Amino acid sequence: MKRRKLTARNADINRLYEESVQCTVFEVSFINKLFKRYNKTKCKSLREDFCASALISSEWVRHNKDNIAIAVDLDRTMIKEAKNTALSRLSSEQQKRIKICYGDSSKFNTDKVDCILATNFSYFVFKQRKKLIDYFKHSYKQLKNRGIFMLDAFGGYEAHQLLEERTKHKNFTYVWDQSSFNPITHEIKCHIHFEFPDKTARKRAFTYEWRLWMLPEIQECLKEAGFTKVDVYMQGWNEKKNEETERFYKVTKCDADPAWVAYLAARK
């Protein structure tokens, strides 16, 4: 049966977001590797903050029959979406090992877990230092002893610029649009657009109003919140192919690249 062509009218923007932005197999593998490296044991329980469609949590319970996941988000529409998609993606046994909860990630209490995940720069929504530290303190309390809090961040001098970046996928083009940036406050406004072969588009399918936090600030706030050690992992570079690799390495120094993405691992 011929696959229907994607257009602005029939596209599911949540599925397009997942395909464009998220790489759950990598992130689940990365969590497992880091946790075992730090603690010499397996990571069993995961909490996914700002979970949206809870894609990582779903992959987590699929990955291992002993894994459990808790997914938290403040958007009721996305929580409903996450529950519906979990039903279609997971077996009945796997569904028993995932909890999808409506709540404020900075305040919502759950069972303590081995790892808390805040990715896709979601915590950038906290624009004041106190609010960011309050969220980090809450995350610290929600972790088991020797637990890990994993976050991502982006930067580089292009992060301060107004720009549009296009990435072509099989049936659509993903557009990352940095539409405004205030150097004084580091407030940044970004949009995600989707463009289709028939020349239609879903403009501003997603909009983000953040503070662009810098790595030293994030590390300082994590330590102020109580975390004993914070490591930074940067993506490797293949000199022959002149492109990024899929591996991330723990670093204390890196080049002043125009754009970069990093992971931070904060240990309790």
Predicted regions and their residues:
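SAM-dependent methyltransferase
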Residues: 150-221
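A short glycine-rich, Lys/Arg-flanked "PGG" loop and its adjoining helix->strand segment in the class I
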Residues: 131-145
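A short acidic, Gly/Pro-enriched loop at the edge of an enzyme's catalytic core
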Residues: 106-116
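Conserved SAM-binding loop of SAM-dependent methyltransferases across substrates and taxa
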Residues: 53-66
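Conserved class I S-adenosyl-L-methionine
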Residues: 42-52
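C-terminal lobe and adjacent flexible extensions of AdoMet/dcAdoMet transferase-like proteins
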Residues: 212-268
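Conserved SAM-binding strand-loop segment of SAM-dependent methyltransferases
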Residues: 90-105
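Conserved SAM-binding loop
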Residues: 82-83
